[in-house]
Design a protein with these regions (language model features):
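Hydrophobic h-region of N-terminal signal peptides that target proteins for export
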Residues: 15-23
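Intrinsic structural disorder
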Residues: 1-4, 17, 85-88
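Bacterial N-terminal signal peptides that target proteins for export
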Residues: 2-12
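Glycine-rich nucleotide phosphate-binding loop and flanking beta-alpha elements
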Residues: 76
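Rhodanese-like catalytic fold shared by cysteine-dependent sulfurtransferases
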Residues: 10, 22-56, 61-64, 79-135, ...
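Short hydrophobic beta-strand that contains or immediately precedes a catalytic carboxylate
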Residues: 58, 69-73
Length: 188
């Protein structure tokens, strides 16, 4: 081997050592409880007692109206310290057409009012049918949808479908997205 080849091999080895190690979804195991921090990180490939679907499977469910789609992406509130009269433009949320947007319901710990919001909107969307299919999603690598799907299972719904690629996977497949608004808060 020439000196130049030795140098190239050494450089390649150093470069490999400098590359950070990535954790894939397959390496991520399910936690016993809810994820309570670092919500934008690789998620497990599974969710006990839920069906996990690909984009193609989610599309098939959507096209056949086989389930209710629940978007749990958080909603950024108007900043509390914004001076009166300041124009506040919300960032629009584009989600899967026909979805029910229940923001902030995927956090690891929910305030009682947020849990009531989730429960009452699920009851309304499913018409109280605990076996109705419920597809839960957010964005790819977002624990919000995993947490929300786990919580919905814990509420007694038996046909929970987790779509981990969310609107990222949907958009990549060139499927339609529509601007959405959150469901209004319900009375306690």
């Amino acid at each position: 081997m020439t000196a130049m080849m030795h140098r190239a091999v050494r450089c390649a080895l150093v470069a490999l050592l400098c590359v950070p190690t990535c954790v894939s979804a397959q390496d991520q195991s399910e936690p016993a409880g809810y994820r309570t921090e670092d919500y934008r990180a690789p998620t497990p490939a599974t969710l006990k007692d839920a069906r996990v679907v690909t984009t193609a499977e989610a599309e098939q469910i959507w096209r056949t109206s086989g389930a209710i789609f629940i978007d749990v992406l958080p909603h950024a509130p108007r900043p509390a310290n914004l001076p009166p009269g300041t124009i506040w433009r919300e960032k629009p949320r584009r989600n899967i057409p026909g979805s029910v947007w229940l923001p902030d319901t995927g956090y690891g710990a929910l305030a009682p009012v947020t849990e009531h919001y989730l429960r009452s909107n699920l009851a309304r969307a499913t018409q109280g049918e605990m076996t109705k299919g419920i597809v839960v999603y957010c964005l790819r690598d977002c624990w919000m949808s995993w947490n929300a799907a786990k919580r919905i299972l814990g509420m007694g719904y038996s046909n929970v479908i987790w779509y981990p690629d969310g609107t990222d996977g949907w958009a990549e497949a060139d499927l339609p997205l529509r601007e959405s608004t959150p469901e209004p808060p319900s009375s306690p």
